[in-house]
């Protein structure tokens, strides 16, 4: 991502097309129609649990403060917008309903590269560029049907 931008880099689109295809054709996304998984799914159903499948995008920014004239109030908003743009594109490419997708933003608080001790300006800018990213996670987990907000 460019600094202060949530727009997807057009150069990343071929990779996103591949990721969308992987999601669409993955065994996990077809689990309900495959005989070999019926015993597992029945066991989950009988235990009153559900199998949740989620494609999650986690957005990140560099450490630079957001200027007053920006479209975003802070790095949390910017990182969230990056993640949201990515999941919307992946949903489109995977040809899947958006309920499988989630997006969240961490702002500058989970950097890939710690920049505290980097003195060289070009190395610092390179590190900041690495921190401007969205990470994609493909999760499957079992959730109790009885689980509610009151129990958490």
Where are these regions (language model features)?
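Periplasmic OmpA-like peptidoglycan-binding domain that tethers envelope proteins to the cell wall
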Residues: 2-11, 15-18, 23, 29, ...
């Amino acid at each position: 991502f460019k600094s202060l931008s949530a727009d997807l880099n057009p150069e990343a689109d071929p990779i996103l097309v591949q990721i969308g295809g992987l999601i669409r054709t993955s065994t996990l996304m077809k689990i309900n129609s495959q005989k070999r998984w019926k015993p597992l799914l029945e066991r989950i159903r009988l235990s009153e649990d559900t199998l949740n499948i989620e494609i999650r995008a986690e957005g990140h920014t560099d450490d630079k403060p957001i200027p007053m004239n920006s479209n975003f109030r802070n790095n949390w908003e910017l990182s969230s917008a990056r993640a949201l743009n990515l999941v919307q594109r992946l949903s489109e490419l995977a040809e899947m309903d958006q309920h499988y997708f989630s997006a969240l933003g961490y702002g500058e608080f989970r950097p890939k590269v710690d920049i505290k001790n980097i003195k060289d300006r070009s190395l610092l800018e390179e590190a900041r560029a690495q921190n401007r990213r969205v990470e994609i996670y493909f999760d499957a987990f079992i959730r109790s049907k009885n689980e509610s907000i009151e129990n958490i």
